[in-house]
Curated annotation (Swiss-Prot):
Residues with Phosphothreonine modification: T542
Residue ranges with Basic and acidic residues bias: 508-527, 741-760
Location of region: CCP110-binding: 300-750
Location of the protein in the cell: Cytoplasm, Cytoskeleton, Microtubule organizing center, Centrosome; Cytoplasm, Cytoskeleton, Microtubule organizing center, Centrosome, Centriole
Gene Ontology biological process terms from the UniProt entry: cell projection organization; negative regulation of cilium assembly; regulation of mitotic spindle assembly
Keyword Cytoplasm in annotation: yes
Keywords on record: Calmodulin-binding, Cilium biogenesis/degradation, Cytoplasm, Cytoskeleton, Leucine-rich repeat, Phosphoprotein, Repeat
Limits of the IQ domain: 558-587
Residue numbers of Phosphoserine PTMs: S308, S413, S500, S530, S763
Annotated SMART domains: LRR_SD22 (SM00365)
Location of the region described as Disordered in the Swiss-Prot/TrEMBL record: 506-529, 715-769
Name this polypeptide is given: Centrosomal protein of 97 kDa
Length: 865
């Protein structure tokens, strides 16, 4: 158990303070060392779960058990003398044990788990009640707490204020409803019964929070229109413009025409009459009108103040009293304070009343002595004061507390009238020109009075008119225009002397000596009086004229200086703080920027268009070059193909004729020449014939061949061979038939296939020829072996071979014609050479056939594989 620590000792009879905060206490045991005279017990920041064994502290007045783990508060039931109970930030679920605490004045249950406001009505002496940051959903019955001044309910889940007129006491001055769930702004109408409410907080509720669907509006004038005596709303002092707007909403507008449930309609109306300004100090047309009204109100207040001063100083006093008061230089502020203490003060309304002066700027108040702080001038139960501006409201500093908002200190004195005139002269100059001239004149007159050490009443218009009338009477009397009794002249002279003291302090001693003589000694006769009067009248007139001239010159200089200062200040203020001037400058900048952006955009578009055109031109040129290059390549290929065909045609014709037909057969040679001529004619005709569908429009590249061309070429070659065989049939039949060997009709297909392969592999002729020679030699050897065994059978079938000879000859002629049409001669030449070699081998093997003809040896090469 921690030991109690005595922090401070009170005087005898008042007890002491025990602070056990932060000691890690979990419970209060029965051996609690509590003295009988302890009046304050602090148990903050421990781990106490239950309040027990506090009966020993019977005289306990203040108990604080903040930031613990309390679940119940029944342990305070026997502390009947308790006045302050601080139990915030615990886990208390319900209010209990307060029925006997009739002396309780201050109760803090913030930050707990309360769901209802129960059993608090018994604490009739309660003045401060903090139930913030709980789970309270509706206002409970507090009507019996007639002394309650402060009720803090922020941070709960209250949705309606419908029960406020019945449950809340009329004496309530501070009410905090911030951070709740009030969704209808019309609920504020239920607070109209709280006539003494001065401070209200309703911020961070859904009804006043900005949403994208609802236009911005200023809810402050609407709340003030229901709570007429409200001075502070959401931590800011109610300004005079807001008060005027609230009065307009109450009297002429539709502020009270809406009922609970019409939140959207109310918000739309407030958005039109009380729009929300986004910039600080931004004034709309309505704000300008309100400022003019307030400036005129201030001007009339000053007029009433001057009239009250003049009427207080207007009664004539004896010469001795006036002479004795002038050298003392009594300030008008002291006179006003005396009049304020002697006469009663009555509040006129909410915005020109006694309460609004308490909300002045504290920093300005603290810069001046307390003896000068006053702005109240009363006459005939009329209270006058200066109006607070919006700048004062925005710059005011409020005292913060644990409950978000606390009352503003109202005991401070307001500003003095002279200081108020100096401070507000500049502001009035910015609002209204007419009022500005009056304020500048008042400021200049104050400076002049300070330099010449004359009191404030000497500068009033009434006193100046009085002095002018006195001077006129003196001049008229001297000129004999108006008969005037001698006492009047004496009084006028004395008054002028008294006034001249204020304008010429360097001649004070002389004037005082002149004044003391008539005071101490009574004039003996009329002659001495008239003599003194005749001596002083010229001097008084000259001094008065000089004084008036000096006043005019000095006043003109001050006016010029003030005009220059005011012009400079107005220019600076307009450029930096006037919303219209700032908007105009901003608009000019935006226009220039927009013009520059448009110019740059046009330039970029022009450059982009030129770039696109250049790109299109370049693309067209590339396509044209590509097309021309393809044309050139196709022409080159076509030219090569034509040259190759022509060369092959010229080179292939003689070997074929010399190989196939011997020179001793003139008939075959002539027929071959005629067939060659026909073939050449067919070659030329085939290039031009339109009916050949396989030919492309472009010249043949030489890399492809169509089947139709082969078919036509075969047909022409067959016709040629038919004509050739008819002429040489007799010579062929005369040769030996035994040397000619053809197997079957299938050999013809093999020969045609070999010719097709040779046509495809024309580029590798030499390699193919060598391989073909090896292959044919091997095949020929095998066939020779077979021929030796089947020689007898071959002789029997010689007739069959003779019958098949024309067909074989036609086939060979077809192959030769195909080679001629396509211009491929090397394979045919290789075939002829190979057949010659094979015929030599056959001659060696078959020695009994010497009469074999070379032509038939060529035909003998067609071997079946």
């Amino acid at each position: 158990m921690a030991v109690a620590r005595v922090d401070a000792a009170l005087p005898p009879g008042e007890g002491s303070v025990v602070n056990w905060s932060g000691q890690g206490l979990q419970k209060l045991g029965p051996n609690l060392p509590c003295e009988a005279d302890i009046h304050t017990l602090i148990l903050d920041k421990n781990q106490i779960i239950k309040l027990e064994n506090l009966e020993k502290c019977k005289r306990l007045i203040q108990l604080s058990v903040a930031n613990n783990r309390l679940v119940r508060m029944m342990g305070v039931a026997k502390l009947t003398l308790l006045r302050v109970l601080n139990l915030p930030h615990n886990s208390i679920g319900c209010v209990e044990g307060l029925k006997e605490l009739v002396h309780l004045e201050w109760l803090n249950l913030a930050g707990n788990n309360l769901k209802a406001m129960e059993q608090i009505n018994s604490c009739t002496a309660l003045q401060h009640l903090d139930l913030s940051d709980n789970n309270i959903s509706q206002i409970g019955d507090l009507s019996k707490l007639v002394s309650l001044k402060t009720l803090l309910l922020h941070g709960n889940i209250i949705t309606s204020l419908r029960m406020a007129p019945a449950y809340l006491p009329r004496s309530l001055a501070i009410l905090s409803l911030a951070e709740n769930e009030i969704r209808d702004l019309n609920e504020i109408s239920f607070l109209a019964s709280l006539t003494e409410l001065e401070q209200l907080s309703i911020m961070n509720n859904p009804c006043v929070m900005a949403t994208p669907s609802i236009p911005g509006f200023d809810y402050r004038p609407y709340i003030v229109s229901w709570c007429l005596n409200l001075r502070v709303l959401d931590g800011y002092v109610i300004s005079q413009k807001e008060s005027l707007k609230a009065e307009w909403l109450y009297s002429q507008g539709k502020g009270r025409a809406y009922r609970p449930g019409q939140h959207i309609q109310l918000v739309q109306y407030l958005a039109t009459v009380c729009p929300l300004t986004s910039t600080l100090g931004l004034q709309t047309a309505e704000d300008a009108k309100l400022e003019k009204i307030l400036s005129k109100q201030r001007f009339h207040q000053r007029q009433l103040m001057n009239q009250s001063q003049n009427e207080e100083l207007s009664p004539l006093v004896p010469v001795e009293t006036r002479a004795s008061l002038i050298p003392e230089h009594s300030s008008p502020v002291q006179d006003c304070q005396i009049s304020q203490e002697s006469e009663p003060v009555i509040q006129v309304n909410s915005w020109v009343g006694i309460n609004s002066n308490d909300d002045q700027l504290f920093a300005v108040k603290n810069n001046f002595p307390a003896s000068v702080h006053t702005t109240r001038y009363s006459r005939n139960d009329l209270h006058l004061e200066d109006i607070q501006t919006d700048e004062d409201k925005l710059n005011c500093s409020l005292l913060s507390s644990e409950s978000t908002f606390m009352p503003v200190a109202s005991g401070l004195s307001p500003l003095s009238p002279t200081v108020e005139l100096r401070l507000q002269g500049i502001n009035l100059g910015l609002e209204d020109d007419g009022v500005a001239d009056e304020s500048v004149k008042g400021l200049e007159s104050q400076v002049l009075d300070k330099e010449e050490e004359q009191p404030l009443w000497a500068a009033n218009e009434n006193s100046v008119q009085m002095m002018r009338s006195e001077i006129n009477t003196e001049v008229n009397e001297k000129a004999g225009l108006l008969p005037c009794p001698e006492p009047t002249i004496i009084s006028a002279i004395l008054k002028d002397d008294n006034h001249s003291l204020t304008f010429f302090p360097e001649s004070t001693e002389q004037k005082q000596s002149d004044i003391k003589k008539p005071e101490n000694t009574q004039p003996e006769n009329k002659e001495t009086i008239s003599q003194a009067t005749s001596e002083k009248l010229p001097m008084i007139l000259t001094q008065r004229s000089v004084a008036l001239g000096q006043d005019k010159v000095a006043l003109q200089k001050l006016n010029d200086a003030a005009t220059k200062l005011q012009a400079c200040w107005r220019g600076f203020y307009a450029r930096n703080y006037n919303p219209q001037a700032k908007d105009v400058r901003y608009e000019i900048r935006l226009r220039r920027m927009q013009e520059h952006i448009v110019c740059l955009t046009d330039e970029i578009r022009r450059l982009r268009k030129e770039r696109d055109e250049e790109r299109i031109k370049k693309f067209v040129q590339e396509e044209a070059f590509r097309f021309l290059w393809n044309q050139v390549r196709s022409l080159q290929v076509w030219q090569q193909t034509v040259d190759q065909r022509l060369s092959s045609w010229h080179t292939d014709v003689p070997p074929i004729s010399s190989t196939l037909v011997p020179s001793k057969h003139p008939l075959f040679t002539q027929s071959q020449e005629s067939s060659c001529d026909q073939n050449a004619d067919w070659f030329i005709a085939s290039d031009v014939a339109p009916q050949e569908k396989s030919l492309p429009e472009f010249p043949d590249s030489g890399f492809h061949s169509s089947l139709t061309e082969q078919v036509h070429s075969l047909q022409h070659s067959l016709d040629f061979e038919k004509s050739s065989t008819e002429g040489s049939e007799s010579s062929i039949m005369g040769n030996s038939i035994d040397t000619v060997r053809y197997g079957k009709e299938s050999d013809l297909g093999d020969v045609s296939e070999e010719h097709g392969e040779w046509n495809k592999e024309s580029s590798n002729n030499e390699q193919d020829n060598s391989l073909l020679e090896q292959y044919l030699t091997s095949v020929q050897q095998l066939e020779d072996a077979d021929e030796r065994t089947n020689f007898d059978t071959e002789t029997r079938d010689s007739k069959l071979h003779i019958a098949c000879f024309p067909v074989q000859l036609d086939t060979l002629s077809d192959g030769a014609s195909v080679d001629e049409s396509h211009g491929i001669s090397p394979p045919l030449q290789g075939e002829i050479s190979q057949t010659q070699e094979n015929s030599k081998l056959n001659a060696e093997v078959q020695g009994q056939q010497p009469e074999c003809d070379s032509t038939f040896q060529l035909l003998h090469v067609g071997v079946t594989v």
